[in-house]
Curated annotation (Swiss-Prot):
Keyword Ubl conjugation: no
Protein name in the entry: Aspartate carbamoyltransferase catalytic subunit
Gene Ontology MF terms in the entry: amino acid binding; aspartate carbamoyltransferase activity
Lineage start: Bacteria, Pseudomonadati, Campylobacterota, Epsilonproteobacteria, Campylobacterales
Substrates-to-products reaction catalysed: carbamoyl phosphate + L-aspartate = N-carbamoyl-L-aspartate + phosphate + H(+)
GO cellular component entries: cytosol
Source organism, top-level taxon: Bacteria
Description of how the protein assembles with itself and partners: Heterododecamer (2C3:3R2) of six catalytic PyrB chains organized as two trimers (C3), and six regulatory PyrI chains organized as three dimers (R2).
UniProt keyword list: Pyrimidine biosynthesis, Transferase
Record's function text: Catalyzes the condensation of carbamoyl phosphate and aspartate to form carbamoyl aspartate and inorganic phosphate, the committed step in the de novo pyrimidine nucleotide biosynthesis pathway.
Residues involved in carbamoyl phosphate binding: R49, T50, R99, H127, Q130, G250, P251
Statement: the UniProt record of this protein carries the keyword Phosphoprotein: no
Length: 292
């Protein structure tokens, strides 16, 4: 049984095949590949973009979707996560998409179910479909000539599962990463690092801005988000007319992560990422369900 828990679960060749199929899915036309199949989504953390994206992807493939409302489920009444998984599995879904605040939950659930598990984000650990859609967006923009391209990942890297997955995936395709963050947001990771965004802005082809994850901070690290923005907001004054693209996994804190004028700039690919995300998740669900 194949699962997607981290980006390591797919080889480079499999990823390129996914991208080829995802490109076809960008036409947004309905398909029947998963007719008669069902996809269950169970999100123990709030999500608008990711959960909606997976549900849209499943429906476009012809699958039925069961969205489990965790706030009303038995898990909120004391049922263990594993009992919830066992009960879901008894309904014989074709795949389960799970998000949880604790790292490792999707991996553990894979031992209690008999269908593919797709990790929709677990703690600070991984968000594989986000990294796949980020790479797909980069690949499409640069016509798949990405070896040697340089990316700055900017912001709350230490607490970001998106960053963790991109740190695993992007170098596999020859993309050079520099981490840009204040010391308390910087992970202990053997890679190029700087605390000053202006030091790298002239050298990069891509900027990936990350949300400041205040919900994962035990104590405040800045007096205000405005103070953080003074050093790390992606603004027009910073990027000027440079030939680069800007990514963000969402939700964007406007004028904290990215300024309003940059959000409206054609170099900002945030909405392209959203569109690409549905296509990538269609390709992932099709692959895992039909190969299981």
């Amino acid at each position: 049984m194949r699962h997607l828990i981290t980006t390591k679960d797919f080889s480079n060749g499999e990823i390129l095949a996914l991208f080829k199929e995802a490109k076809e899915f960008l036409d947004e036309k309905p398909r029947t590949f998963l007719e008669g199949k069902s996809v269950t989504t169970i999100f123990f953390e709030n999500s608008t973009r990711t959960q909606s994206s997976f549900e849209t992807a499943a429906r476009r493939l012809g699958a039925k979707v069961l969205k489990l409302d965790v706030s009303r489920s038995s898990s909120s009444k004391g049922e263990t996560l594993f009992d919830t998984a066992a009960n879901l599995d008894a309904m014989a879904p074709s795949a389960i998409v799970v998000r949880h605040k604790n790292s490792g939950v999707p991996h553990t659930l894979a031992n209690y179910t008999h269908c593919p598990i797709v990790n929709g984000g677990d703690g600070k650990h991984a968000h594989p479909t986000q990294a796949l859609l980020d790479l797909f967006t980069i690949m499409e923009h640069f016509d798949y000539n990405v070896k040697g391209k340089k990316i700055a990942i900017v912001g709350d890297i230490k607490n970001s599962r998106v960053a963790a997955s991109n740190l695993e995936l992007l170098p596999r395709f020859g993309i050079d990463i520099t981490l840009v963050a204040p010391p308390h947001f910087m992970p202990n990771y053997p890679i190029k690092k700087t605390n000053k965004l202006k030091e790298v802005i002239d050298d990069v082809d891509i900027i990936m801005s990350l949300r400041t994850q205040t919900e994962r901070h035990n104590i405040p690290t800045y007096a205000s988000l405005k103070d953080y923005a003074n050093d790390f907001c992606i603004s027009k004054d910073l990027i000027k007319d440079k030939n680069l693209i800007i990514l963000h996994p969402g939700p964007v804190h406007r004028n904290i992560d990215i300024s309003d004028d940059v959000m409206a700039d054609k170099r900002c690919k945030v909405l392209t990422q959203v569109k690409n995300g549905v296509a990538i998740r269609m390709a992932v669900l099709k692959k895992l369900i039909l190969e299981s």
